[in-house]
Amino acid sequence: MRFQNPFAFRPGPVSFWTTVIYLALVIPLIYVHETVPPAPSDRSLYQGLNLTEAWLDLQTISRAFHPYNSHENDVVRQFLIDRTKEILDRNSMPYTTETIGGVDWHTRNAFVQTQDSDLNPRDEFIQSRPRGATLFDDKISNVTWTYNTARPTGTNIAKGTWMGQYFEGNNYYVYIHGKDDPEGEWWRSESAYKKFRGQGGVLVNCHFDSVSTGYGATDDGMSCVSMLQLLSYFTLQGRQPKNGIVLLFNNAEEDGLLGARAFGYSPLLHFTHTFVNLEGAGAGGRAILFRTTDLQAAKVYAKSPHPFGSVVAANAFERGVIKSATDYEIFADIFGQRGMDIAFYAPRARYHTNQDDTRHTSVNSIWHMLSAALASTERFSQITGTTFHGDRSDGKSDLVQNGKKAEGVWFDIFGSAWAVFALRGLFAWSLTLLVATPLILVAITYILARKDKYYFFSRDIKMHHDINDDPVVLGGWKGFLRFPFALVFAGALTIASTLLLAKFNPLIIYSSPYAVWSMTLSIFYFSFWLIMRGASFIRPSALHRGYVLIWLFALGWGLQVVGAVAEDRLHIAALYATVFLQSAVFLALFISLLEQFALLGKHDFAMQLHDAHQARDISSHGTDHESRPQPEEEPAQPEGDEDESEDATETTPLRANEPGYGSSTRTSFAATYRRSVADNAPSPPRMRRYQPYEHEQSWSGRLPSWTWIIQFLLLAPVPVILFGNLGLVAMSALQMTGTDGGSLLVPVLTLGIVSIFLLLPLTPFIHRVSHHVPMFLLCVFAGTFIYNLVAFPFSDSHRFKFYFQQVVDLDNGTDTVSIVGLERFSRSVIKSLPSASSQDIKCEKAVGRDLMECLYDSSSLSPHLVEGKTPRELITFETVDGTNASKGRLRIDALDSRLCYLHTSRPIYGFAVDGGAARDPRFGGFPSEGFKTIQLWRRDRDRPWTVNLYLDEHSQQADKSFEGEHKKLGDGSVVHRRADDPLEVTVRCAWSDANKPGTIPALDELLKYMPTWAAVTKKNVGLVEVRKTYKV
């Protein structure tokens, strides 16, 4: 039995190798995506690290809800303080405690900029500062600012509602002294600030508050316990960092990144040149590198043992595609620091719910974050030179001078390797693909054409100029139009299936994303194979594979134009995967062109074929009888004539059965001439036969049959890895955004588009795949399509998330519960509640969200927020001395609450809280038209707010910072307020502590009676709001 080439371009090998290679790529991708690397045992960890200890700390932190506006928050804060002291004592690390805060960096910056810049940053340094730490217990810093709700971290122009905000922070942070840091309490010296615009230190940040409906195990307890382990590691003997490290445990992140803003008043602000922000936007799983500020920071992350992330996420944040906010925005965009955002990101169904607990996460997840944080922090603390020191790229002198940054591209490979390079390098690569590769292909084409071996787009060849002479058919255009037709057909079916799914059951991706993947991949594979295999069966072509590669190259070239513009003009690196795909397509097409060097020249082939036919005809006539044939007689036909038994091919003359065109009927002259030649010439030798595949062009027999596997290995692995990884991350990031008010179409459509890109590397070879694979996938499509259309989208492990708030309006005497979510499922939740089952529920569009708000009466479940107090007794409001026509001076208090809102009946043009800082322009601009809402926070529940409201646009008593900003933005018009025009102020105070059963009976009822496939989270900062309007 003859041995068959296992890599021949035949249905068996092609079906086997393409399937095996795709499975070998996809299965590890899914495994890496769905699992977390196992944590090492405590004995094998670096000295100073202990995962058992970290897990116990996490259980302690997440034992109860601990939002900023709760008593449990104070318990967690004290626990962190006690644990840091315990760790320092255990490691015999000397430490001191500071209560400094509230540094006015605007005044200090002005001072620094006027100082002599010739000072040597090392003047007061000693050779090596001894080990030590300083604990900063900041109960001083407070922040006042105005901002637009459309751009909470913006500076000037935005659409939305303008608000004022006042926050009193209570951050806690530990400064681990570095070897190169100056001696003493340098943060108390003005000149020391100047020096620390040198090398600087590293800021590592977490927030220890949770939302009011979540225990905060992943968001953000795991980050905080990781930082406790970093403290243990870096304070051991012999582990002192070169540059100092600041471990910041900030508070009230969940309420608007408030703790990070308060750190803007820390004396260590300009000391920290770099940062590592640890966050949790999911519940367990792997910690992804959400984003970095630059290429150099991405290179620092490369030290992580299990890197995970992509620059696509960073671009999505920059362009507003991902709307989640983290402290990264404050550190990078406002303070000007350089660093990274490492965060858990899935599953969002548990995010901000009561399943964000230790039961739904693992030690492995702690280790994944801890190992990345440790590697990045250690590397940041070791870097010297100008990498993170020196003049800034943007030239802003008021921000930390941490060097010039470069834009980068980064991504992981199977969660084990980290690729990082400059964006300019990617742009250069794109330009090379746009310019050099077409020239190379043109050059090869020219050489082939000169050698008469370029069979693409070839026309038929006429051997003689006789008008009656039929040409030799080469079939050079066969297969040219198949790819665009198949791509449009298969792509349309794939997109149509996602659109149909988005119309009837879009949320199925919430719980069954792999069923959606299976549907989109199988329909594209089958429909593309159907067209290509059918076309190949009807009109076989050896140029089929090459033409597909030409089309892929042309499409990729157009996509590279878009990519190059995005990279150069928009500074977007998210299209990096297309560069790898286009490079692979170019190399595969290059091989297809090189294959044609193995062929005969087109005219040589035509001549050889022509001569072979003539010789065969002459040989056959030479064996005829020697009698002289008459013109009207038909010559005898030799037995076994191959022309009678062979089927017609593209090389058979079109008039083969006519006299003089290959038929056995000849003219008398021709017969006499051929017979005479046969009589005097020996029989010609038999031409060597190169058999083409099936009925493809006869010249193609010389083409090598094994080069396809090289092309496939170039085309498939790298693009499939890159697009597959991006698709899986996009799946996890987007699949549960529908219940948050996100688009219901985008998640399923994204999977459809990624499926097409995943299978593009297979398209040049799919016509040789046997029917077994596509028919199996057709069955897969049928099953998954039906399942996706009819299955219920939620389950106990993938719960429908909705938003809750109870509002007690003392003016109207109403007590209502607001349920915000997708209306169909929100109504199902409300119907399950005894108190609301008989009510007529009204739903309307929710403010600020693409969701519906459903209200029901909850007067039978009135909240018990303060023991022995009714809602009417919770808020105190009074006007104090100093109130006049241009200024209102108010005192507000709320029992056992840290938060109240003020909403005025007419615009105000400034506000100030007694004892508070002036407005900070770093956190937002100021509207010329004024604003009507103020949010007030306090750290001490027993101390009321005394607020000054500036009512006149040009009030001389107005805060200077407000007045100056207004003069810059205003139109100069004067607004005169009548003394008898009363100002109405609506006070809304919030309560968020739901740890004690019975405090919020309406929430207790929800948790008890709602379906198991539903999960409740907070609608606003407060679970309960009490409202009352007062006249000033």
UniProtKB/Swiss-Prot annotation:
The EC code for this enzyme is 3.4.-.-
What is the membrane topology listed in the Swiss-Prot or TrEMBL record?
Answer: Multi-pass membrane protein
Compartment annotation: Vacuole membrane
Q: Which residues lie on this side of the membrane: Vacuolar?
A: 33-426, 504-511, 567-573, 730-745, 795-1032
Broad enzyme group: hydrolase
Annotated residues that bind Zn(2+) 2 are located at 219, 254, 352
| GO terms under cellular component | vacuolar membrane
**Glycan-modified residues:** 50, 142, 812, 884
| Requisite cofactors | Zn(2+)
Membrane spanning stretches: 12-32, 427-447, 483-503, 512-532, 546-566, 574-594, 709-729, 746-766, 774-794
Q: Which family does it belong to?
A: Belongs to the peptidase M28 family.
Name of the protein described by the UniProt record: Vacuolar membrane protease
Organism of origin: Fusarium vanettenii (strain ATCC MYA-4622 / CBS 123669 / FGSC 9596 / NRRL 45880 / 77-13-4)
